[in-house]
């Protein structure tokens, strides 16, 4: 074996200093890309209409802003005129979760009358509770075999009694307290007496006008107690509700009447009634 072995690079026939054209193709380099032409005086096309569009938009925004200010001033002027005329815009705000009526005692009722108004509102809610519990008790009696007629009557009492009480006596009292109107006070006294009479009648519930057991009075409670203790207990609870409602309502009408007489509204109402009668006669 020879001392030196031949190597693949030991090729004497390849001369690196030889003519480059004779170098094999594998060792040749790629030619670079030609440079891009440079034009120092080249210009960019900038749209000249963009400045005009901005000015037009600014002008449009200014016009809209001026229009909004003009409308705000017009609305404020109308509100001031309405306030000077004594007209109150009643926005529905109660109950908060589903507004049905306008009710804002703390901001619209004079502070010395707010206590009476709050108690009157309590009597309004008390009537709702009384008639609602009346439905529950009568439904229990119907299930125990008293018949469906009393249940339908209890539903009628609730459907007609709750909105009727609000329209007939609570809203007139609210407006009378707010505006200090003698005629509205007179209407409240007239309708609220019917409310008190109904509550007292319902607490007794004699079977003379309404179907006896359609109201949870003391007489139906004693009657049904002998047949079913549970129904009797429900009726006695309803009797207690109507008694409490009657007492609160009597207190309210006493307080309103004391204010009405003490403020001179009674004489004012007589004068107003006389004046209207004379105008009607003429």
Swiss-Prot record:
Keywords: Cell membrane, Coiled coil, Cytoplasmic vesicle, Membrane, Phosphoprotein, Transmembrane, Transmembrane helix, Transport. Residues 1-49 are annotated as: Disordered. Residues 18-30 have a biased composition (Polar residues). Probably involved in membrane trafficking. The chain crosses the membrane at residues 118-138, 150-170, 185-205, 233-253. InterPro entries: SCAMP. The modification Phosphoserine is found at residue 31. Residues 1-117, 254-282 are cytoplasmic. It is a multi-pass membrane protein. It comes from the Eukaryota. Belongs to the SCAMP family. It is found in: Cell membrane; Cytoplasmic vesicle, Secretory vesicle membrane. One of its GO terms (biological process) is protein transport. It holds the Pfam family SCAMP. This is Secretory carrier-associated membrane protein 1.
């Amino acid at each position: 074996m020879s001392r030196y072995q031949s190597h693949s690079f030991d090729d004497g026939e390849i001369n690196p200093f030889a003519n480059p054209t004779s170098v094999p193709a594998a060792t040749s380099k790629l030619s670079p890309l030609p440079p891009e032409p440079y034009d120092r005086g080249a210009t960019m096309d900038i749209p000249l209409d963009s400045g005009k569009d901005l000015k037009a938009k600014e002008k449009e925004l200014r016009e809209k802003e001026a229009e909004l200010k003009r409308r705000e001033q017009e609305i404020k002027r109308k509100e001031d005129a309405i306030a000077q005329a004594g007209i109150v815009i009643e926005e529905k705000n109660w109950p908060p979760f589903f507004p049905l009526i306008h009710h804002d005692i703390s901001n619209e009722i004079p502070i010395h009358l707010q206590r009476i108004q709050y108690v009157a509102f309590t009597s309004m809610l008390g009537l709702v509770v009384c008639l609602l519990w009346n439905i529950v008790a009568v439904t229990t009696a119907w299930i125990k075999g008293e018949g469906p007629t009393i249940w339908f009557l209890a539903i009628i009492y609730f459907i007609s009694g709750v909105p009727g009480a609000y329209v007939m006596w609570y809203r007139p009292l609210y407006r009378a307290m707010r505006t200090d109107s003698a005629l509205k006070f007179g209407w409240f006294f007239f309708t609220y007496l019917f409310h008190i009479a109904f509550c007292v009648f319902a607490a007794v519930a004699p079977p003379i006008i309404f179907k006896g057991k359609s109201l949870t009075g003391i007489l139906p409670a004693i009657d049904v107690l002998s047949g079913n203790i549970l129904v009797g207990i429900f009726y006695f609870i309803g009797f207690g509700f109507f008694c409490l409602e009657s007492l609160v309502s009597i207190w309210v009408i006493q307080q309103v009447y004391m204010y009405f007489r003490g403020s001179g509204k009674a004489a004012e109402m007589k004068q107003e009634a006389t004046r209207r009668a004379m105008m009607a006669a003429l």
